[in-house]
Amino acid sequence: SEWMRKRFDVNQVFLTTSCTHALEMAAFLSDIQPGDEVIMPSYTFVSTADAFVLRGARIVFTDIRPDTMNIDENLIEQAITDKTKAIVPVHYAGVGCEMNKIMELAEKYDLKVVEDAAQGVEAYYHGRALGTIGDFGCYSFHETKNYTMGEGGALVFQKSEYQEKAEILREKGTDRSKFFRGQVDKY
């Protein structure tokens, strides 16, 4: 995790069992509630949608660009409603989505951005590592991805306000991380 923190210039790195697990953590940390809408590309792996459906969200699929196979940034705004809570750009094959436009829309409508960068390790958008531009970035280390470990993933984010909840989620509802740091006597 220290390598990722330095290499990608990100404050928080949580190694996970998979990108699916990282996406599920990001959905929880984004406070996705039943009835919320989450915008994502129509072309993605099922885990991208499942992570948010498990929280009760309604998925709003948006068409992709034929030149990149990524979400068409020009179609996102028309999909936004008063129930929209997040945008999930998927960086297909290491090709970055148009994050400047996506971040502008997120700011305009006060939406979370969860980057599915499963295929984006060591890929960049205007000098920034994919997965470090939005609120959360999710990576995969599955055998079919850029960096492989057989399985595994990572959740990254900049804001320290999510750290404690992320630690508790990863540690199955306990404050085990605080125990290892000597901040509590037991967990």
What are these model-derived regions, one by one?
Residues 105-110, 128-136:
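Radical SAM/AdoMet-radical enzyme domain recognition
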Residues 11-12, 36-37, 152:
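Short active-site oxyanion
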Residues 120-126, 133-187:
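Active-site region of PLP-dependent enzymes
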Residues 2-26, 40-43, 62:
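Short loop-beta-helix segment that forms the pyridoxal 5′-phosphate
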Residues 28-92, 96-117, 124:
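PLP-dependent aminotransferase-like
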